[in-house]
Design a protein with these regions (language model features):
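GIY-YIG nuclease catalytic motif and its immediate N-terminal context
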Residues: 1-34, 39-52, 56-76, 80-86
C-alpha cells in the first residue's frame, strides 16, 4: 500500500508527499532527511493521509494535491474532518 500525506509545518505551511510508510517518512522529515522543503520548514504534524493501492496512483494523487491552492487544500481537509466527525 502507498499513501499520500500532508504535513503541517512550523511556519503554518503545508507539505504534500507520498510514501509506503507514513510514520517512517514523517520521522525522516523531522530529522532533516526528508524532502528539501521540510529541511527549512520543520514539519510538526501529519494532518492528512490517504491510502492508495499502487505507487503510480499515489504519485498521481500527490501531483494532483500539489497543484491545488492552499485554500483548496484547507477546504478539502475541513470537509474530510466534517465527514469523519459525522
Amino acid at each position: 500500500m502507498w499513501f499520500v500525506y500532508i504535513l503541517l509545518c512550523e511556519d503554518n505551511s503545508l507539505y504534500t508527499g507520498y510514501t509506503n510508510n507514513v510514520s517512517h517518512r514523517f520521522s525522516d522529515h523531522k530529522n532533516g532527511k526528508g524532502g528539501h522543503y521540510t529541511r527549512s520548514h520543520k514539519p510538526i504534524k501529519i494532518i492528512y493521509s490517504e491510502q492508495l493501492p499502487t505507487q503510480s496512483q499515489a504519485l498521481k494523487r500527490e501531483l494532483e494535491i500539489k497543484s491545488w491552492s492552499r485554500k483548496k487544500k484547507i477546504n478539502t481537509l475541513k470537509l474530510v474532518l466534517m465527514e469523519k466527525n459525522s
